[in-house]
From Swiss-Prot:
Signal peptide location: none
Keywords: Exonuclease, Hydrolase, Nuclease, Nucleus
Biased composition (Basic and acidic residues): 92-107, 140-149, 161-170
EC number: 3.1.-.-
Name listed for the protein in its UniProt record: RNA exonuclease 4
Residue ranges of the region described as Disordered: 1-51, 79-179
Primary localization class, coarse: nucleus
Pfam family, one: RNase_T
Compositional bias per record (Polar residues), positions renumbered to this chain: 11-24
UniProt-recorded Gene Ontology molecular function terms: 3'-5' exonuclease activity; exonuclease activity; nucleic acid binding
Amino acid sequence: MAKAKVKKDQSPCSGSLGKTANTPKQKRKQKQRKFWQNHPKITTKTGETKKVSLLLPPKGPQEFSSNWKALQELLKPKENQALPATTLAKCPKKDQKVSEKKTEESVPQKSGHKINGGITSVSAIAKGAKAPSQATPTKAAEKSDEVSKGKKRKIMAEATDTEHQGKKPQGEAQPQPPKVDIWFDDVDPDDIEAALGPEAGRVAREMQGITDTRSPTVDKILVKERAFEGLTRTVAMDCEMVGVGMDGEESILARVSIVNLFGKCVYDKYVKPTERVTDYRTAVSGIRPEDVKKGEPFKVVQKEVSEILRGRTLVGHAVHNDLKILFLDHPKKAIRDTQKYKPFKQKVKSGRPSLKLLCEKILNVKVQTGEHCSVQDAQAAMRLYTMEKKSWEVAIKAKYTGVMPVDRKSKGPQKDKQCPQ
């Protein structure tokens, strides 16, 4: 007998295993299909950008104007770029995402418009592609609405910040005039003028409420413009003193100023008082307590002045008082004192003429009308010297060398005339 073939049981498990092996791939494919069905924009964008690059140049005037408008919109800075980094950092990311979604939804997705034979979609135009003139006003209106909303948010945020910090008046927001830029606390306007120029000194005096005793005509007469500003072989010095002691009659040094032959200030420093000051003599000296507090030590100033005067001709008015207060000595041959010069005494008709009188009669300039300035006094003494320099030097040479000055008319020594000191 033939053996009957035993049929293998086709269990449901065997069939199910084959099907389950393909299920992950099928699921992936289904997910991909669903993804591309739900997101058709990505495929259209890639194709549309390629089409935009193949656009031909405009032929008609209408197309040219519309493309020009589209190009202007392209060149406009984007909202995110226009906003500063601080404002972008303050805005939360959620608000930015919401605004991006609104912009995408606001632009309708149409099939496209024909431009020079090519087809472009509205989404491509929103990205920066060239669009006809009909679509531009609507986009501009939408953008302006979005920008206005963003500005309103910024204004509200700034208003809340100001409320937390404290309300400030609107007048402070206005830009202040440039005069405030050259305001310095506890700084003498003369120092500001020496460092920054006469205009800065004038503004500083106005801000501090100090009347400027020096007029522009005085500076023009006493100082030579566009001249050498360094040390010369001839210098003029003047000092200001303050009172010490019980009655304030004794004097100590408070300020030293030195100018060159052309009236340019080369040295000007305040000196710290070595004793307790009882009388600052502000009405005459122009010295105030805050000036000498930040001054230099006396020994430092004394050393610096002695180095400047060494080997140079010294000009001044009653210079012996200035040298005495500095505890310095200078050879008489190198001193030119405007108070002791005899031709000046004869012109003014005074045995001990003041510097103010000499300037009024000889230079036709008014100085020392209010508070004294050591720089101006030194400049005035130097100007008086330069006017009589030739005759003065001839007289000094005759005095110390024994050679009498020769009169050009008589061509002989002037025996009768005395040499001025």
